[in-house]
């Protein structure tokens, strides 16, 4: 504790400033009060020179005028001055020091000057007793620059007058205020008079922050604060002034901002002169443009949109009506031409099936033997549908006129189906004409060798060997997938070719009667299973097992087993119709040249029918019961066709 107290005492002793070394400037030795006057006389020369140098160094300051200033405030004070209190007495300005001129140097101190130094008022008893006046300049340490000018007038006796002027400037160098302080010493008393003059209006500190917060829209408003007010505004502009009053607290700034805003609004209205006329005609808004400016713009937009809609509406309606008429026309033609479209569907289902290439010259006999009831333009349309070999392109279905639909018979439809299949793949069969027609063939029985349906092709009751052309033709159409010795080599698989021709023959046999409407076919699709083979009391029944060899013929109660490698075999009985037997599977054998199938003459080697040669019924056996059953079985043909194709694909 003692050690700490001793340290504290030592610190206090060192912190006390020792001003004794400055006493020789004022009091000489500074220690003896008796010799104080003599010692002071020894050092007055140095102090006078220092004061003069300080006043001469600040002579470049500009004297500012003192006119035209308002808000003058004065303060008077009376103080007593005692000798020996220079360092202990504090003036009204902190950090003040005094310099006093004495003796012979009194006339020199009468000059007026400015200096930049921290100075105070000289207060010494000796100066007042000797009647010496001093004149110095001062400057206080503040945020802004302060220039001061002090004038002293020496009087007789104990009287002296000291005048000090302070000038405050801002950072831009503009004068903000001028303070004049007059000190009179009369009989040891000091009279202090202070006068302050301001250069202009003092800005509100709150408004200083408003220019950064609310008045960002008009950055030049601060510079326009000293400008005179603008001309009086019109009657419509005071309302805008009220709207902008919340942004500015100064009336001058508000007027300048309103002038800028009004000019921008007038420029904007020039673009909407035509719009304002429209709104005035409607009578929905007042005549004041600035109050309803935004409402006008919105109203004009709505009117323009409505006008554009009304002008474009008739065009849209016309186009819509035309499109609806076209759609309705197409819909009516599609409903009325269901048979023609079904033919098109049949052709698209067999896109993956190809036929062997044959000469294109074989197409020419078809033109001469086409049905006369069907117009030529329809036939050409049907031919042109499938000329393109691009499978990706959509095939347009021709629309048959309503007047020709009544003449389109079932026979024509089958002919079209065969013709489409031939034209699609470019492999038509050669036309073989026969003059023998005893009238025993059914009308609806198709002829595979003849593309013309109207030309009959009938085998005689006495079987004979087919011609070379027929044999070559049918071998081209039905070649097995394996390499079987034949007259001509096959380049395409047999199963796909066989499926087309077999289904056409079966379809012709099943659908010899009238076709039911299309809606009944859909019902029969679900009623008739696809696996059921057509069977009745008077027609042929085909029952093909898994291997495709056992065929049951129920016409005259004959049961025969026919194991061949061909896809079609002919079995003929005396007094009965030859039957075309279709098989879905193929059995490879060493030789398929011919197969004897004559039941009445089993040992006759002359009567041999080629395995690939189809035969057609000679006599019609169709009654009412047969027609009704064949109508029901007609719809399941395509299902069986698709299923048989899948079977071929699975058996590969």
From Swiss-Prot:
Entry keywords, A to Z: Cell membrane, DNA recombination, Meiosis, Membrane
The UniProt record lists the keyword Cell membrane: yes
Signal sequence coordinates: none
GO biological process: one example: DNA recombination
Biased composition (Low complexity): 316-336, 545-569
Membrane-topology descriptor: Peripheral membrane protein
Stretches for region Disordered: 123-151, 304-406, 470-576, 594-652
Record localization: Cell membrane
Gene Ontology CC terms, in alphabetical order: plasma membrane
Highest rank taxon of the organism: Eukaryota
Biased composition annotated in UniProt, kind: Basic residues: 380-390, 640-652
Residue stretches of biased makeup (Polar residues): 125-141, 337-361, 506-517, 524-544, 612-621
Described function: May be involved in the control of meiotic sister-chromatid recombination.
Protein name (Swiss-Prot/TrEMBL): Meiotic sister-chromatid recombination protein 3
């Amino acid at each position: 504790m003692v050690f700490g107290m001793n340290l504290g005492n030592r610190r206090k002793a060192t912190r006390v400033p020792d001003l004794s070394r400055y006493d020789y400037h004022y009091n000489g030795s500074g220690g003896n009060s008796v010799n104080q006057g003599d010692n002071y006389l020894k050092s007055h020369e140095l102090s006078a020179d220092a004061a003069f140098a300080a006043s001469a160094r600040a002579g470049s300051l500009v004297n500012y005028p003192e006119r035209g200033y308002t808000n003058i405030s004065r303060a008077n004070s009376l103080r007593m001055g005692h000798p020996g209190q220079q360092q202990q007495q504090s003036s009204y300005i902190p950090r003040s020091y005094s310099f006093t001129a004495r003796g012979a140097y009194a006339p020199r101190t009468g000059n007026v000057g400015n200096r930049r130094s921290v100075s105070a008022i000289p207060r010494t008893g000796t100066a007042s007793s000797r009647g010496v006046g001093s004149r110095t300049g001062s400057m206080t340490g503040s945020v802004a620059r302060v220039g001061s000018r002090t004038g002293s007038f020496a009087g007789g006796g104990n009287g002296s007058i000291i005048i000090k002027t302070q000038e405050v400037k801002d950072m831009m160098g503009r004068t903000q205020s001028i303070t004049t302080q007059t000190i009179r010493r009369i009989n040891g008393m000091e009279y202090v008079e202070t006068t302050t003059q301001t250069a202009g209006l003092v800005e509100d500190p709150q408004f200083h922050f408003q220019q950064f917060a609310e008045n960002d829209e008009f950055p030049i408003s601060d510079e326009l604060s000293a400008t005179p007010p603008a001309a009086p505004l019109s009657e419509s502009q005071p309302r805008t002034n009220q709207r902008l009053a919340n942004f500015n607290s100064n009336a001058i700034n508000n007027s300048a901002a309103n002038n800028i805003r009004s000019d921008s609004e007038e420029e904007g209205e020039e673009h909407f002169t035509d719009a304002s006329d429209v709104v005035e005609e409607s009578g929905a808004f007042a005549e004041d443009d600035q109050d309803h400016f935004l409402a006008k713009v919105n109203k004009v937009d709505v009117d323009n949109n409505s006008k554009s809609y009304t002008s474009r509406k008739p065009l849209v309606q016309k186009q819509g009506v035309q499109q609806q008429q076209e759609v309705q026309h197409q819909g009516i033609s599609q409903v009325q031409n269901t048979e023609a479209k079904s033919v098109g569907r049949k052709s698209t289902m067999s896109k993956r099936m190809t036929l062997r290439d044959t000469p294109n010259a074989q197409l020419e006999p078809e033109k001469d033997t086409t049905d006369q009831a069907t117009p030529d333009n329809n036939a050409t349309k049907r031919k042109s549908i499938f000329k393109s070999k691009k499978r990706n392109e959509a095939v347009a279905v021709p629309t048959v006129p309503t007047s020709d639909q009544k003449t389109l018979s079932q026979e024509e439809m089958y002919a079209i189906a065969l013709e489409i299949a031939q034209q699609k793949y470019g492999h038509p069969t050669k036309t073989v004409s026969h003059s023998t027609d005893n009238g025993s063939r059914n009308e609806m029985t198709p002829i595979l060798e003849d593309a013309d349906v109207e030309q009959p092709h009938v085998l005689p009751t006495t079987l004979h060997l087919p011609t070379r052309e027929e044999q070559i033709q049918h071998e081209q159409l039905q070649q097995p997938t394996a390499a079987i010795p034949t007259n001509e080599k096959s380049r395409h698989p047999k199963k796909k070719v066989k499926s087309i021709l077999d289904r056409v023959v079966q379809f012709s046999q099943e659908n010899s009667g009238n076709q039911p409407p299309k809606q009944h076919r859909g019902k029969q699709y679900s009623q008739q299973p696809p696996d059921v083979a057509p069977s009745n009391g008077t027609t042929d029944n085909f029952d093909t097992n898994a291997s495709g060899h056992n065929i049951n013929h129920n016409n005259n109660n004959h049961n025969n087993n026919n194991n061949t490698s061909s896809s079609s075999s002919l079995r003929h009985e005396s007094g009965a119709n030859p039957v075309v037997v279709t098989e879905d599977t193929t059995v490879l054998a060493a030789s398929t040249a011919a197969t004897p199938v004559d039941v009445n003459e089993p040992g006759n080697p002359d009567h041999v029918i080629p395995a690939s040669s189809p035969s057609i019924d000679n006599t019609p056996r169709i009654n009412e019961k047969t027609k009704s059953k064949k109508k029901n079985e007609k719809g399941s043909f395509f299902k069986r066709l698709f299923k048989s194709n899948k079977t071929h694909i699975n058996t590969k």
